A protein has these predicted regions:
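C-terminal binding/interaction regions
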Residues: 2-33, 82-149
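Short Gly/Pro-enriched turn/cap motifs at secondary-structure boundaries
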Residues: 35-38
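Short beta-strand scaffold segments in enzyme catalytic cores
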Residues: 40-49
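Histidine- and/or cysteine-centered catalytic micro-motif in compact active-site loops
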Residues: 48-50, 59-60
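Short acidic-glycine loop/turn motifs at beta-strand connectors
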Residues: 49-51, 123-124
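Compact, glycine-rich, soluble single-domain proteins
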Residues: 59-74
Length: 149
């Protein structure tokens, strides 16, 4: 680990300290389980429910690309299947030059569950912090379904 990486890692430890560190470590760990025989692009996600429980997900590719499930959605679907529907923070990590950004489908799934913090990161310990509304402004939501009723 370079000196700069160590400094950034120390910053992660100092920001919301333990929780962010746990999310980062779990996302990096679950990333190794990614099934990516076609792209080789592994992504890990760790999602903190408001209950305090952490749910993880990795991307799972399919030869029929449209059936691929991203790490972020995998974490959300796991959380919902276990009864969690309120979230505080999502952290996503990949081996990219800049912190990895979620795809549009994942952004829409995030927006379904509110405007919580999203932390984009990479294996170089860089992070970008934002909220769901910044990733997907003007999102389609339940209010759109009531138009004209």
């Amino acid at each position: 680990m370079t000196k700069k990486q160590q400094e950034v890692m120390m910053m992660i430890y100092k920001t919301q300290d333990e929780v962010i560190r746990q999310l980062y470590e779990q996302a990096v760990r679950v990333r190794e389980n990614a099934y990516v025989p076609y792209s080789g692009f592994k992504v890990g996600a760790a999602l903190l429910g408001k209950s305090g429980k952490i749910f993880t997900g990795c991307n799972v590719e399919n030869v029929s690309y449209g059936l691929t499930v991203c790490a972020e959605r995998n974490a959300f679907f796991k959380a919902v299947s276990e009864g969690e529907t309120s979230f505080a923070v999502l952290l996503v990590v990949a081996d990219t030059p800049e912190p990895v950004s979620p795809c549009g489908a994942c952004r829409q799934v995030m927006a379904e569950f509110g405007d919580f913090e999203v932390i984009l990161s990479n294996l170089s310990y860089q992070i970008k912090r934002m909220f769901v509304h910044e990733l997907l402004p003007y999102s389609f939501d339940k209010d759109n379904l009531n138009v004209g009723k």
